[in-house]
Design a protein with these regions (language model features):
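Long, well-ordered alpha-helical scaffolding segments within enzyme catalytic domains
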Residues: 1-38
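A charge-rich, low-complexity, intrinsically flexible signal that marks solvent-exposed coils, linkers
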Residues: 5-8, 48-51, 55
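Generic structural marker for isolated residues within well-ordered, non-membrane alpha-helices
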Residues: 23, 57, 101
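Surface-exposed patches in mature extracellular/periplasmic domains of secreted proteins
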Residues: 29-41, 113-116, 137-140
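Acidic helix/loop microenvironments that form the catalytic cleft of cell-wall polysaccharide enzymes
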Residues: 37-51, 119-132
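Acidic, His- and aromatic-enriched active-site or binding-groove loops in soluble protein domains
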Residues: 53-80
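C-terminal accessory nucleic-acid interaction domains of nucleic acid-metabolism proteins
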Residues: 81-85
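Short acidic, glycine/serine/threonine-rich helix-capping segments at coil-helix boundaries
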Residues: 86-158
């Protein structure tokens, strides 16, 4: 908008139905696996922000078997293993940064692990959050974002 804030539109039910039908048709026609259904921001996080955090990825996964989504129980299992008092310090160290950069790369994000926080890393985390944690997309690898990432890697190891 004119103030420099990002504004993301809501997707109404009619749009979601049309998106699902179109994506299903294209995926079937070209034999695209459901796990390869991605958004611009997943592919080019430093340049693209669409479809944004309000895009209904979870609904497309649950209702139409499109895309990827994590299992809540698996996420919770990873989350309960985290020690809150040390997590932030661990993840802000070079080893921690390298660890989560590598995890994002394992899931398919085009990030080169360096052990340093840079704009590319922040934008990649933000894109990941748009897709899998749309309630909070600040580009910070916090405990919940890490738990979701681990749950996805466990569910989709060959991604």
């Amino acid at each position: 908008d004119s103030t420099g804030l990002r504004v993301f539109p809501e997707y109404d039910n009619a749009q979601v139905l049309k998106i699902a039908a179109l994506v299903k048709d294209i995926a079937n026609r070209y034999s695209i696996p459901a796990t390869n259904i991605l958004g611009h921001s997943d592919i080019a996080p430093t340049r693209k922000q669409d479809p944004g955090p309000k895009f209904p990825w979870k609904k497309l996964y649950n209702d139409y078997q499109l895309g990827m989504w994590y299992d809540e129980a698996t996420k919770q299992n990873f989350f309960t293993q985290i020690i809150p008092e040390t997590f932030g310090v661990e993840m802000s160290s070079a080893q921690g940064i390298f660890k989560y950069q590598t995890a994002l790369k394992t899931l398919g994000y085009g990030l080169d692990p360096s052990g340093m926080i840079d704009e590319s890393t922040k934008k990649t985390i933000e894109a990941f959050q748009y897709h899998f944690r749309p309630e909070k997309y600040d580009g910070v690898m916090d405990a919940e974002t890490w738990s979701i990432l681990q749950a996805l890697i466990q569910k989709y190891p060959s991604k």
